[in-house]
C-alpha cells in the first residue's frame, strides 16, 4: 500500500483533473493535507498509510491544531481530510473513514460590531460642503446607514433607482434579486444636494461618481467610510459593512420586527438576520441592569 504522502499526491491530481477545482481551492487542499501527513509521519513514521490512521490519532491532531488556529480553520482542515478519505473509500484503498467519527468544531459566534447612535449621528456630520466631494461622501454615508445596503448594492445604484419624492430605493441584491428599501429623510436630502451640486445626470448614470466621473467602486467607498469614522473615534478599522450592521442593530433596538429587517437587508434566510438579536439582547441586559431596582447588586451587609 502507498505511503500517505503518495496517496495525497494522487488525490490532488484527482481534484485537479476530475473535479476541476480552482487553483486557490487546490492549494488549500494541498496545504491542509500536507500538514496532516506531517503530523502522521511524526507520530507513526514516514511509511504510515491512510489505513493506519484511526479516529484517536485524528483527535490528537485536531487537539494540537486547537492551540494554534481558530475553530473555523480546524473545520476546514477536517473537511479536507474527510474528502480525502471518501475518495480512498471509493477506490477501495481504505476500509473506513476515521474523519466521519469526528464532529466538526463549532465556530465561535462573532457578534457584528456596530456604532452606537451617538457615533452614527456624529459620523453623518463629518463630511462638509467645504471639502472636495463632501456632499457626495455625506450622501454615501447617509444612504448606507439609512437603508442598510451592501457596498456592492450602493455602488451599483443608478439615478433611476432612486425615488426621492417617495423616499425609496430600488436595489439589485445577491443572486440578482431586486428589492425596494426605504430611504430616510436625511438620506433623501443628502442625495438631492449631491445631485444638485453635480448638475444631475441621465436616468442610467451611476448615482455615485468618483473623481474621474466614473462609477465609484467598493474600495473607494471603503476608504471614504474609514476616513470619516476616524474623525469621530479611534477605531482600528471600520468598513461599509459596519454601517449595515449598525442599521440592522438600531432597527432591532427601535422595535422593528426581525422578519422586516430580513427583508430590508435582503437576507435569504432568517438565521442570517438572527445574529443581530445577540447584540440587542446584550443591550437589553445592560438597560435592565441599570433600570430595574431588583437587578442592581445589593449593598454588602455590615
From Swiss-Prot:
Positions annotated as active site in the UniProt record: 150, 174, 241, 244, 267, 276 (o-(3'-phospho-dna)-tyrosine intermediate)
Gene Ontology process terms (BP): cell division; chromosome segregation; DNA transposition
UniProt xrefs under Gene3D superfamilies: 1.10.150.130, Intergrase catalytic core
Ranges of residues in domain Core-binding (CB): 2-89
Alphabetized UniProt keyword annotations: Cell cycle, Cell division, Chromosome partition, Cytoplasm, DNA integration, DNA recombination, DNA-binding
Subcellular locations according to the entry: Cytoplasm
Gene Ontology MF annotations: DNA binding; tyrosine-based site-specific recombinase activity
Presence of the UniProt keyword Cell membrane in the record: no
Signal peptide, first to last residue: none
Main location class: cytoplasm
A Gene Ontology term for the protein's cellular component: cytoplasm
Residue span, Tyr recombinase domain: 110-289
CDD domains documented for this protein: INT_XerDC_C
InterPro entries per the UniProt record, alphabetical: CB (IPR044068), DNA_brk_join_enz (IPR011010), Integrase-like_cat_sf (IPR013762), Integrase_catalytic (IPR002104), Integrase_recombinase_N (IPR010998), Integrase_SAM-like_N (IPR004107), Recomb_XerC (IPR011931), Tyrosine_recombinase_XerC/XerD (IPR023009)
Family, as annotated: Belongs to the 'phage' integrase family. XerC subfamily.
Protein purpose: Site-specific tyrosine recombinase, which acts by catalyzing the cutting and rejoining of the recombining DNA molecules. The XerC-XerD complex is essential to convert dimers of the bacterial chromosome into monomers to permit their segregation at cell division. It also contributes to the segregational stability of plasmids.
Subunit-level organization: Forms a cyclic heterotetrameric complex composed of two molecules of XerC and two molecules of XerD.
This protein's name: Tyrosine recombinase XerC
Organism per entry: Pelobacter propionicus (strain DSM 2379 / NBRC 103807 / OttBd1)
Classification lineage: Bacteria, Pseudomonadati, Thermodesulfobacteriota, Desulfuromonadia, Desulfuromonadales
